[in-house]
Amino acid sequence: MTIYSLPYGKASIPFRWPAGRKLEAIVYDSPENGLSRVQSLRLIREALNRPIGTPRLSQLASGHDRAVILISDGTRLCPSDLLLPPLLEELRTGGIAYEAVDIVIALGLHRKHTTDEIRSLVGNEVFGRVRVHNHSAMPEDCVALGTTSRGTPVEINRLVADCPLRIATGGIEPHALVGVSGGVKALIPGAASCRSIEHNHRLSVQHLASPGDPNNPVHQDLEEALRFVPIHFLLNVVVNHERHVLQAACGDVIAAHREGVRLAASRFTVPVNAQYDRVIVSAGGYPKDMQMYQALKALRNAAAFTRPGGSILLAARCEEHIGNGLLQYWLETMKDRQQMVAKLNERFEVGPHKVLHLDEVLARHSVHLHSALPRHFTELLGFKAEDDVQAVVDAWAADESLTIAYMPYGSLTYPRSPSP
């Protein structure tokens, strides 16, 4: 008997697997040794010493009296508490003091963070010394700067738009809608208005992105916005599920991002060389399973490795339940998934757009969910609630005709086409 574990919230769920019974592991590429906070800081500082396509940040800061830093929110693995101190050191060297710096949490349309969450996000070294703001996507809190060639209004957080030195941070990993995270995503959707975000995301209906590849119309639309509100310096990192930095790149927002994408190439994508009758998947634990809105990424990834008609067991704690008020409202008031899909095809809306992802999975697979999500939400999603992971595993393992796979970090493990 072998013991495996599924990351779940801030803990894990163990399950037993019978000896001799085949269980395929589908995992992303993360080193098992040599990772630490000290090593992460070393990689960040090395990158800051060798910016790509720009002078050092300290030189860029010289002559400016203010700076703003965009950071990822708490649903992301990006270790802002590690990125901020070296960035602030560079700014101080260039003559910009702590009190002249504003940090904006690039929430996009996600919920605002509490004081305790902000402290955890930026770290004790920074909290209380530098002003930290939750981004507001309300149009009245943003300034209109132009329109992209694809019609996306460029409406940006007023504090960010008005600042003479704009710095973006973030993590690089595949993204279902825009191909890859990091780079300009800190600006749009991170610090943009709801109108900007919705118009850009709507492009994803016509233009499918390949995970890990920024060369698609949706991402190109984001980068076009830089003509109206440039990012002056970028610091991006590639991190694993424990927030350890694996690679870092900084400098010009396009050039440094592309280098980060190159460094991350193939790390988070796994070739779909086979599909399985059953897939056991974890969203990857906290923060990837804070809410169903985020955990659905793992479900979509697992579905790519599941045969049509097959089943998926998803472990995602979802302490914040659905995690998006508008999506929850649609689920509770419309209930019929096909009605929701039809409405989204008429008019795309961010939040409810996750129903399209849900429908994509449920049209081909059945989904079993182990979660803290209230049962009525589980049923509204079209899933079967499972209180006992081991019981499901035992039933599947007992059927020798079934091929079964295990994905411990589903939100970080994206499918790619096998090599020809």
Question: Can you name each region flagged by the protein language model?
Answer:
Residues 352-411, 418-419:
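Internal helix-turn-beta structural module
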Residues 66-77, 102-108, 168, 280-282:
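Short glycine-rich or small-residue beta-strand-to-loop segments that form or flank ligand, phosphate
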Residues 98-109, 311-316, 366-371:
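Short internal beta-strands
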